Amino acid sequence: MAATPKHTLLVVDDEPDVGDSVHDLLRREFRVLKAKSAAEGIQLMHDNEVHIIMTDQRMPQITGVEFLSKMRIRHPQAVRMLFTGYADLEAVIAAINQGHIYQFLKKPWQPEELIAAVREAAAEYERLVHQAEELSRLRDEIHQLRDRVTMLEQEVKRLRGA
């Protein structure tokens, strides 16, 4: 019996063959969701816990960079990947510099390249989750220490007044 995939990957591309090929290539390691539009991708993000988002740059209504920018705000821990068969170099550079994407892939890709990139994205997701958990733990610890300092200050005032 095969293990249940740990990470969910959303592929957004208006060309169904792309989503199908990514699904066929990665379905043993990842739960792969496919969307043919940004609107469908947003709905799948709303309905599922998605860890990795892959989107094409050139789509109707909205570019991949615009879509990933929106997803960064709504789902900051999801690792965002952009791919294109065209040389939209300025848009890609801007997206990378603004932190909207983790990785850029050029179509067509080699299967090994795609598998490695998605595995790296899954590892990055795990790092981000661990980092968020550690940050939360440290905030709780700081809060507890502040409470303890307040109690000690009150005790010092009480002892000085006695």
Question: Which residues does each predicted region cover?
Answer:
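C-terminal output helix
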Residues: 87-90, 109-118, 122
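C-terminal output/effector regions of signal-responsive regulators
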Residues: 126-162
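Receiver (REC) domain active-site loop signature in two-component systems and cognate sites
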Residues: 59
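Active-site beta3 strand of CheY-like receiver
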Residues: 48-54
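Short amphipathic alpha-helix used as the core "switch/output" element in two-component signaling
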Residues: 43, 65-77, 94
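Active-site residues of response regulator receiver
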Residues: 56, 84
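Helix N-cap/capping motif at the beta->alpha junctions
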Residues: 34-43, 64
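Two-component/phosphorelay signaling modules centered on CheY-like receiver
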Residues: 4, 16-34
